[in-house]
C-alpha cells in the first residue's frame, strides 16, 4: 500500500488543536493509504528537548532499508527551510513529493466571501515561503476560528481535505511509476 507521511506542528498536539488534522488523516485513510503522522517542532530546540523537522523526518519516515513514505504532506505553516537551521539539500535527497497543505489564517466565512480567496498573509505563509522548499501546492484544508480569551482553533474544510488526500494519492502513485 502507498504510504503518506504527514508532518504536523508539535504545538497543535500540545494545545489539543487537532480536529483539522484528524479529518485530513481520515481522508487519507479512506483512500486506502497508510498514514504516518508525526508531530514536530519546526527547528531543533535543546531547551524544549525537541528535534527539528529534518530529524523528525529522518527518524520516522526512513528506516534501514530507505524511505518508508511515497509522499509527504506538510501541514506546518511557513517554509521548512527559510530562516531556519535546516539543510535544504536534505529535502532534495528525500526524492519524494512534498505537498504543502494550507491552513488559513482567517475564518471560513471570510475566506468563502473573499473573491480573492486567500489573504496576502495566507499567500505569503502558505504559498510564497514554502516555494523555497520546492513543494507542490495543494489546497486550503483548514481555517482559523477565534473563540476569544486566547482560544484559537483550526477547523477542517472536509471537502478540501478529501481533495488534498486524492492529490497525495496521485503523487504517490506517480512516484512509483517506472
Q: Can you annotate each of these PLM segments?
A:
Residues 1-178:
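An N-terminal assembly and electron-transfer interface module characteristic of large anaerobic redox
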Amino acid at each position: 500500500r502507498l504510504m503518506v507521511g504527514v508532518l504536523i506542528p508539535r504545538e497543535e498536539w500540545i494545545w489539543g488543536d487537532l480536529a483539522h488534522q484528524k479529518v485530513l488523516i481520515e481522508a487519507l485513510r479512506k483512500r486506502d493509504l497508510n498514514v504516518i503522522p508525526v508531530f514536530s517542532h519546526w527547528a531543533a530546540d535543546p531547551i524544549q528537548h525537541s528535534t527539528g523537522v529534518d530529524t523528525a523526518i529522518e527518524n520516522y519516515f526512513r528506516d534501514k532499508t530507505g524511505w518508508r513514505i511515497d509522499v509527504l504532506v506538510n501541514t506546518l505553516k511557513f517554509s521548512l527551510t527559510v530562516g531556519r537551521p535546516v539543510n535544504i539539500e536534505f529535502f532534495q535527497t528525500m526524492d519524494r513529493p512534498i505537498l504543502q497543505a494550507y491552513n488559513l489564517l482567517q475564518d471560513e466565512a471570510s475566506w468563502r466571501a473573499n473573491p480573492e480567496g486567500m489573504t496576502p498573509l495566507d499567500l505569503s505563509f502558505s504559498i510564497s515561503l514554502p516555494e523555497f522548499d520546492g513543494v507542490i501546492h495543494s489546497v486550503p484544508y483548514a481555517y482559523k476560528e477565534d473563540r476569544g480569551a486566547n482560544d484559537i482553533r483550526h477547523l477542517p474544510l472536509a471537502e478540501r481535505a478529501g481533495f488534498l488526500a486524492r492529490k497525495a494519492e496521485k503523487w504517490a502513485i506517480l512516484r512509483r511509476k517506472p
